[in-house]
Amino acid sequence: MSLTDYVREVSLADFGKPFKHQASWNRRLRTTGGRFFPKDGHLDFNPKILEEHGETVFRQIVRHELCHYHLYFEGLGFRHKDQAFKELLDQVDGLRYAPKLQSHQANYLYICQDCGQAYDRKRPINLAVFACGRCHGRLIEKNQS
């Protein structure tokens, strides 16, 4: 079964409405489970979510994106902050946030000396230039082991 067929099946089963556009995989997505494109109505999904978290979580993410999709084409509020979106997401048991991926590993850990805020980074940062985003305190590198 193709991804578009799967999304059509979920749309009919959980929303009672047809999905009339295309769904595709997007391997470039890192921290999000999927994306809705209002301009042409297509959906992109992160294949790593299905691989790492299974079909149950992936189906909830499909529901999340279909909430955006159906609300947009009905002319209702389709953004995360809109009440219509939040209510529909609760009704269909969709995920509000995508779960963290194990494949996204941080190599560097920086801690603010003043407030204790932690920052995980894949790439090193210049401690002479960058400061804490919360309190503007000095950052120190903590060894990851």
From Swiss-Prot:
Indicate whether Electron transport appears among the record's keywords. Answer: no
Its domain of life reads Bacteria
Instruction: Enumerate the residues binding Zn(2+).
Output: H64, H68
Q: Which cofactor does it need?
A: Zn(2+)
Query: Which SMART domains does its entry note?
Result: SprT
Q: What are the protein's UniProt keywords?
A: Cytoplasm, Metal-binding, Zinc
* Cellular component aspect of the GO annotation: cytoplasm
Q: Which residues form the active site?
A: E65
| Localization annotation | Cytoplasm
Query: What NCBIfam families does the record point to?
Result: PRK04351.1
What's the family? Belongs to the SprT family.
The protein, known as:
Protein SprT-like
Q: Name the source organism.
A: Streptococcus equi subsp. equi (strain 4047)
